[in-house]
Every structure is written in structure tokens, then in C-alpha cells.
Regions:
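Bacterial N-terminal signal peptides that target proteins for export
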Residues: 1-9
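C-terminal motif of bacterial Sec signal peptides marking the signal peptidase cleavage site
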Residues: 17-21
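Bacterial signal peptide processing site
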Residues: 23-25
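N-terminal low-complexity, Pro/Thr/Ser-rich intrinsically disordered segments
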Residues: 29-67
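Non-catalytic, conformational "gating/processing" segments within enzyme and secreted inhibitor domains
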Residues: 34, 38-41, 82, 125-208
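Acidic/histidine-rich, surface-exposed loop or edge segments in extracytoplasmic proteins
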Residues: 49-58, 90-94, 108-113, 163-172, ...
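Active-site-surrounding "flap" and adjacent substrate/cofactor-binding loops of secreted or lumenal enzymes
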Residues: 52, 101-133
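Active-site-proximal helix/loop microenvironment
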Residues: 85-92, 96-103, 200-208
């Protein structure tokens, strides 16, 4: 995967029974991961403040049709009859809408074509995050989002504000081709899945 043309979006969905062990989901403004050389450390900087401004809209079932259609197509493309993948269409949809918010022109049109041409992908994602992220007596559901941006790029503040306020997302700046960045991303996933997913990324992103 090429790092120079990609902002890496991580979205996790966690469903656990309340009898399971619960970890601390809080995060600091920076994540420092030791490198193989104990005398050096690489710092991953958080670019966003955690400020959630929810948009609660009384959506009808028809409003969620783009999400349902996206989920069906995602499973259709992923199931080949020989494997049994674990997929979260909601996580994939939210991650893509986060990325789509930073696009414009023809690229933005492609995101809308994929995610539903209703012009409301941002508020729809925000509504799902707020509706679904509630604990019940026997169930805990957690949606967590983050964006990892290579340090050769400077993201627009407007996009950072959007993903922070509407997606409750954190954005991190790092050299994505380093093992330290890979370790930090894996640690983020581990922390936000209460240790159920310990390693999502097997190797650093390609520097070219």
C-alpha cells in the first residue's frame, strides 16, 4: 500500500457483553512508541481535539437505504465461497465518508456514487455513531474512528474540524512508512477493541 497518496482511516466496531473485561478507551494527545533502537523514539502527533457536536436527525428507514445497499454490495464483493470474512459495513461506510469529506470534484462524485447520492453522507454517519454507541444492560457497542496522515501532507483544518466534531475522530500525523507508526496504529486498534484485535497492520505502508 502506497503511503504517499493515502490518508489511512481506521474505524473499529466493538460489541461485547458487559461481563467481558472493559479497558480504558481514553487516549492522549500523542502516542509514543519505542523503536527497535531503545535510544530513539518516534512521536505520533494528534491533530484534533475531542469535541463532539452531534447532529441528531429523525431519519426514516428509507434514509438508511444507501447504507443497506452499500453493505449488500460489500458482502457480495467480499464473499467468494471459500472464505468466511468478518466484515462491518457500518465501519466501512463511516471510514469512507470520513475520507470523502476531504475530497472534491470528480473524486467527491465517486464517493457519493459509492455511498449513496443523497448528499447527506456526513450527517447520516454522525447519526449512526450517536444512535448505535449506547450501552444496554447486556450489550456494549463502541464505534471508534481515527485518521492517520503522512507527515509529508498538511490536512486542511476544516476537514480536521469535521471529523473531530461529527465523527468523534482523532487525526494523527506521522511518517507512515515507519514501524513506529505501524505500531501506534495497531496499539490504537488494540486499545479501542479492548484487546480483541491486537494487530491489524502487518507491515509499514510503502514509502514510494
Amino acid at each position: 500500500m502506497k503511503k504517499r497518496t493515502l490518508t489511512f482511516i481506521l474505524t473499529t466496531t466493538l460489541i461485547t457483553g458487559l461481563l467481558s473485561a472493559c479497558g480504558n478507551s481514553s487516549t492522549s494527545d500523542s502516542v509514543t512508541v519505542p523503536s527497535n533502537n531503545s535510544s530513539q523514539k518516534s512521536e505520533v502527533i494528534c491533530l484534533t481535539d475531542t469535541v463532539a457536536e452531534s447532529v441528531n436527525i429523525d431519519y426514516s428507514i428509507n434514509t438508511y437505504a444507501p447504507v443497506n445497499d452499500f453493505g449488500y454490495r460489500l458482502f457480495q464483493e467480499s464473499l467468494d465461497g471459500t472464505t468466511n470474512p468478518v466484515l462491518s459495513p457500518v465501519s466501512a461506510y463511516i471510514a469512507l465518508t470520513m475520507a470523502g469529506n476531504g475530497a472534491n470534484g470528480a473524486t467527491k462524485d465517486e464517493f457519493l456514487k459509492l455511498l449513496g447520492e443523497n448528499g447527506e453522507m456526513t450527517t447520516l454517519s454522525d447519526d449512526m455513531i450517536n444512535r448505535f454507541s449506547h450501552d444496554t444492560e447486556n450489550l456494549k457497542l463502541n464505534l471508534s474512528n481515527s485518521a492517520w496522515i503522512d507527515d509529508e501532507f498538511t490536512p486542511k483544518q476544516e476537514w480536521l474540524n469535521t471529523i473531530s466534531s461529527l465523527y468523534d475522530a482523532q487525526a494523527y500525523h506521522a511518517n507512515l512508512s515507519t514501524s513506529e507508526a505501524m505500531d501506534a496504529m495497531n496499539q490504537w486498534v488494540c486499545d479501542h477493541t479492548q484487546g480483541l484485535i491486537k494487530k491489524m497492520i502487518e507491515k509499514p505502508l510503502d514509502e514510494k
